[in-house]
Amino acid sequence: MVDFDALHAIIAPEAEAMGLALVRVAFFGGDSDPTLQVMAERPDTRQLTIDDCADLSRRISDRLDALEEAGQDPIDVAYRLEVSSPGIDRPLTRPADFADWAGHEAKIALKEKLDGRQRFNGTLVGIDGDVVTISDKEGVEHKLPFGAIDTAKLVLTDKLIAATVPLSAEGADEMEEEGQD
């Protein structure tokens, strides 16, 4: 069994020590491929470099190894650690995500049906208190309690691509030239 509160309490300080914001901690894969997935980002760029991923992975791994040696491992099975950025079609996990990405298309699934529906697709309007608003393709606004949301993620669109500026394109032209030989 996995203690998510304990995992979050262990992982969040490691991310924060690097100046990173934790986006999601998840455990999936079942018995065949148990995986601890950690998504983080730099708050100023909303991105994560490969070096950031490697450094955070080492910090988390070292911390979990030390807890295991002390008999306090929050995960009682062998697992694979995966550290990554949230990606362009990122999950929306924190209230601030719904404000930050207002105006972009999203898919939201609720834990239980609300007004006969469990899934909502449309444009994020934002969040007010603990109520997320999404406008469907007909322009109907749906008010969803943040606590009722099971999963939410951005939908890859041209608008989202344009809004997501890469950290650096340095070296891209050299890669293209190398591939042309």
Curated annotation (Swiss-Prot):
Gene3D superfamilies attached to this UniProt entry: Ribosome maturation factor RimP, C-terminal domain, RimP-like superfamily, N-terminal
Pfam families: DUF150_C, RimP_N
Keyword terms: Cytoplasm, Ribosome biogenesis
Any Gene Ontology CC annotation: cytosol
Subcellular location: Cytoplasm
GO BP annotations listed: ribosomal small subunit assembly; translation
Source organism, top-level taxon: Bacteria
UniProt main location, coarse: cytoplasm
Keyword Transferase annotated: no
Sequence similarity: Belongs to the RimP family.
Record function comment: Required for maturation of 30S ribosomal subunits.
Classification via PANTHER family: RIBOSOME MATURATION FACTOR RIMP
This protein's name: Ribosome maturation factor RimP
Organism: Sphingopyxis alaskensis (strain DSM 13593 / LMG 18877 / RB2256)
Lineage of the species this protein comes from: Bacteria, Pseudomonadati, Pseudomonadota, Alphaproteobacteria, Sphingomonadales
